[in-house]
């Protein structure tokens, strides 16, 4: 009952960790847009032995909110030394924030995270994030009626008031674009001109993923670490994180989903589209056993998933804000979308894109994609 007091419990041991993992399914049980995540995958996400992103965290504490006999909320507070080193600041993060529709519960959870971080002498708090901006991050601000795409967060509209009520202010917004892969033709005159320009230029080559998957992943992530290096909140992917990401994505990807753009024989751009796993697991209730894995394999490998997501897309910095760079990216992206249509995909999400990244926003809009979800990163400076 809402009249019962809230108790904040630090997570220790496996039993409480299972409760921490179970909170989202309880909170969003009546939300038609919620897609229960695979429990084994979420458990691995928290495990430093299985997730290099979690292993990079120097210090962390998970909290549960309990009202009566029920766990009604959760939050994490943590320190990411890679962020501090890269940005030359002392920052604490909050993340994994989900709670019941009660302002007191949200305030109590956020206060617990802040109190823990204050003992670590951080200058400010950023969030929400799940270990870093390279993983799920941002508070959903717009777009509550549609399901989250794979590796994107979900939430409720009242979270914004809870977070801002605790003194957090907007740091930056991130956008998710939605593309109907069979709409928006003919493309704009600019898009058509850029595509033709790339096709006429003998120094530009567009190629699909090669046979050495791990080598290709290293190529595109090298581009990513360069392309995104000046963006808000950027932390470079480490070698371990790149290998882990490749291992996680390989079982669900399709070969035609990764294309690389080369200039004078050197890789300078790429776009990577994957099936939206959340579509395939929509009714599995987070479990693959005893028969969920059969449904999952059928939907991904045989029946086909109709929705995709582009989580990674990049162009080397030296080509930013140039017609040459725009031509290369336009050709690469249109090639991926064409291959996706041939594979039976009907829609695609491109996410996330920083609100001030006009170049990437322009590329999305050239492909007739429209912004349909907004995620917000918050910050709060602490008094010294």
Regions found by a protein language model. Give the residues of each.
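Acyl-group handling in specialized metabolite and lipid biosynthesis
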Residues: 10, 144-150, 207-209
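An acidic- and aromatic-residue-enriched active-site/binding cleft used to recognize and process polar
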Residues: 68, 78-82, 97-99, 130-132, ...
